[in-house]
Regions:
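Nucleic-acid endo/exonuclease domains
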Residues: 1-117
Length: 117
């Protein structure tokens, strides 16, 4: 686990959000997300390789990331991706909080539209 992952784990814990680390999200594939908020079907990835000359910045790395995002979407997950700097400056946890609030509003709206008997 790197520094940004450790910090995001602290932020999620401070907000009282239960999460899983290195969560396998696609059956039959060896794909894992850095964090999963299971109750919200939200995966969180911290992409640091671009900044450190890692695989994410290569053509092959970009194609792998596209495949991973598509696999998550096909398995009904929503995905947020952040850089280590966004975790450190608070952008990531603020975005996660806003996203979870939007999910709650969406659920309320769906409930209001469902027919009653």
């Amino acid at each position: 686990m790197n520094e940004a992952e450790e910090l995001l784990g602290i932020h999620l814990t401070e907000l009282g959000l239960p999460f899983e680390r290195q969560y396998p999200y696609a059956k039959g594939r060896r794909l894992r997300a850095d964090f999963a908020l299971l109750d919200s079907w939200l995966l969180i990835e911290i992409t640091g390789g671009v900044y450190h000359g890692g695989a994410h910045g290569s053509v092959e790395g970009v194609l792998r990331d596209i495949d991973r995002l598509n696999a998550a979407t096909l398995n009904l997950w929503r995905v947020l991706r952040f850089t280590p700097d966004q975790v450190k400056d608070g952008t990531a946890i603020a975005t996660i909080s806003r996203t979870l609030g939007a999910f709650a509003l969406e659920e309320q709206a769906r409930g209001a539209r469902e027919p009653t008997t």
